[in-house]
Structure formats: C-alpha cells, structure tokens
C-alpha cells in the first residue's frame, strides 16, 4: 500500500479540476486539504476560486482573505479576493487589483498564469461580470 501525501492529494484534485470536474464536486476535497494544511496558501487560493465558481461568495471571501494573509504576493489570491469583494459589495478592491497588476507586470510567467485563470473562469462561467471587471483592471489599468 502506498502512502498518499497531502501534496499528492492536492495535485490529484488540481488534475481533476483541469479535467473539467465541477467546482461543487471539488469544494469538499479542497476544504479537507485546507483543514489539513492550514498554512497552504495555494490550497486556500484554490478553495476561494472554487467557491467563486459555485456562487458561494461569502465563503470565497473568507478563503481568499486567508490565502492573501498567508501569501500577500500571490496575484491569483489577490484576484480571487477582489472578485469576492465585488460579489459581496465590499470596499477596498482597488488595493488588491493594484498589487496583482504590479506583480503580473513584473513577472511574465505569473501574468500568463493569471490570463489562463481568467480565461478558465470565463469559460466555466460565461459573462461573469466581476471577473471581467477585475481582468480589465489588472491588464488594462
């Protein structure tokens, strides 16, 4: 019997997402990962994204806040937080968008990853106004 590490579980869950599995099905998996790895910013970032896709905006806000607290330099965590804030009517979105924009401009690989994430979100959830707004702010200023 093999020993499955939390990293393996995380990678498998990401693979399932990338294969098109619905966000609602993956939320419990990522919630469990976050419960077991409380300081894993990537896990919290993924959970926030899944909550956003599932229209669970208050839960997304909490998960995104945790991800940003754990890694303030993660532009995806900042984007998730900005979208969750827009969806829940919070103030202070600009600060998170500006930080994501600065990081994306400084590091081309992260810019490309962000663009892929925006594309994925709009493919899974067409006409997602908040995501479209944040995308325009990050890339067009």
Segments predicted by a language model, with ranges:
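Long, contiguous interaction/recruitment modules in multidomain scaffold/adaptor proteins
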Residues: 1-6, 139-141
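Alpha-solenoid helical repeat scaffolds
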Residues: 42-46, 76-80, 95, 111-116
């Amino acid at each position: 019997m093999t020993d499955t590490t939390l990293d393996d579980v995380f990678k498998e869950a990401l693979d399932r997402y990338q294969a098109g599995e619905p966000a609602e099905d993956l939320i419990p998996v990522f919630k469990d990962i976050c419960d077991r790895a409380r300081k894993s910013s990537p896990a919290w970032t993924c959970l926030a994204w899944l909550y956003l896709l599932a229209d669970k905006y208050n839960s997304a806000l909490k998960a995104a806040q945790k991800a940003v607290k754990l890694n303030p330099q993660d532009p995806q965590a900042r984007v998730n937080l900005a979208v969750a804030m827009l969806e829940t009517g919070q103030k202070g979105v600009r600060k998170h968008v500006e930080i994501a924009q600065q990081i994306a401009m400084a590091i081309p690989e992260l810019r490309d990853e962000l663009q892929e994430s925006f594309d994925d979100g709009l493919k899974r959830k067409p006409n997602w106004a908040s995501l479209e707004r944040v995308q325009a702010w990050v890339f067009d200023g």
